Amino acid sequence: MKRCYITTPIYYASGKPHIGHAFTTILADVIKRYKQQNGYEAYFLTGTDEHGNKIESKAKSLGLDPQTFVDQNVAYFQQMWKQLDINFDHFIRTTDLSHKAQVQHAFQLLYDKGLIYQSNWEGAYCVECEQNYFTYDKQTMLCEIGHQLTLVQEPSLFIAFKDSKDWIGEMIATNKLNITPESRAAELKNNFLDGGLNDLALTRQNVTWGIPVPFDNKQTIYVWFDALFNYITNLGFAHNDPKFNKWWNNNDEEHEVIHLISREITRFHCIYWPIFLHQLGFKLPTQFLSHGWIVDGNGHKMSKSLGNVISPEELLAQFGVDGTRYCLLKEMRLDKDNRCSMAIFKDIYNADLANSFGNHASRTFGMIKKYLGGQLDFIEVQDPQVKQLMDQANQAMVQFDTAWNNFQFYKGINGLLQLVFQASKLIDQLKPWELVKQTDYTLLKQLLFACVRCTQVCFVLLAPILVHTSTQIFDLFNFSAQARSKTHLADPQQLQKISLAPVIQPLFKRLD
């Protein structure tokens, strides 16, 4: 059976979830649902990264112990994912005892292979990013995304990359890691590999909130090493859990492992993580999806200090669950930084959901109710203009899958928007209200059947995003189980008997 293991990065539990967390997690949820629609068995992992100096410092400033602090923040994440209808299979926490034991096991394995050695770390450290810097601006003392750097000099255990430099360089130069968009691979090569890949310090001495080194409890394992291994600790890799071979370490050609990440953490996931896996003899993920930054309407990166952050709560209050999921997925592209504002999302909501998809479904429902008493049986379409619309529905399905399989979600959606536009245009041309007066019920039924077909195609394909509205539409038109299924979508004969619900509830109310 085809399988797909989808992961988000585990989010740093130093505060509440923000719009970037919401986008990545919605994207993972939509991919999971889409894969399941297409016959895959899918497993979706998300969670929280809970160790490190930043957590410890923030907890202390609030008069809390670190565990209490992260417990509070984890609850915010779990509640938000519930509100957004995120259907994950496992929520991992790096404070889980099983995770900690398995991270120590991985560390010990690498040490036993002679890949970890004692030396001294000297350079700059960003507490906010939990990241070391060999090179940095000595004037500003800011990291690459603007956080304050601290000079550090301390003994540390390092992992040797000398036998992996050429390997990872070739993997990235030829994009054998399958990084999307491909421009991210070029960024990694230019920014991190061309100048030489330094060995990585894997431990800190003065951080107590973390996982101790298994053979030296005076040192704590680097938070990024700890965090990256969540993708296989949740599968019980160190315990011979069958889940590890099922979802990760197998040779099935139809098996996919997709890591969703944001641009600023691509280096850790696409350089260090593949090296660790390679050194341990484990398989690599099959796909890395690295989306750009989320910026405000003026192109500025969102940050609390600039006061331009949009919270998921604001989006939910304005657009509801389906509206929030749709606006984020429609607007966000993987190949660029994405401008976001409440005004931009409002325009998308009104144009796409209220005026296009919602209006088409409501209009189709209303015409069948008014002109045909709410009943419509399957009919062979003969009229050339209506047949052209039916053909366009079939083409939209193919184009949608092509786009989504290439993670170009907006392209697939735009094809469906074009479909309902053409349906609206045909309604205005054929004037069903005139067909009734002329008692031309043959053409009327063909037109309305094609409109139902367009409704079916749009809302079956959009069901991974519009989880509530799609079901509402299916119920309004009394679609059979087969008519609601992607498996049978290519066959319009699944629409054998349309019997409308008594009344239609508002779908997407236009926002002023």
UniProtKB/Swiss-Prot annotation:
It is found in: Cytoplasm. It comes from the Bacteria. Its EC number is 6.1.1.10. GO terms for biological process: methionyl-tRNA aminoacylation. It is an enzyme of class 6 (ligase). The keyword Nucleotide-binding applies. The keyword Coiled coil does not apply. Its main location: cytoplasm. GO terms for cellular component: cytoplasm. Binds 1 zinc ion per subunit. Zn(2+) binds at residues 126, 129, 143, 147. Belongs to the class-I aminoacyl-tRNA synthetase family. MetG type 2A subfamily. NCBIfam families: metG. Monomer. Is required not only for elongation of protein synthesis but also for the initiation of all mRNA translation through initiator tRNA(fMet) aminoacylation. This is Methionine--tRNA ligase. The lineage of its organism: Bacteria, Bacillati, Mycoplasmatota, Mycoplasmoidales, Mycoplasmoidaceae.
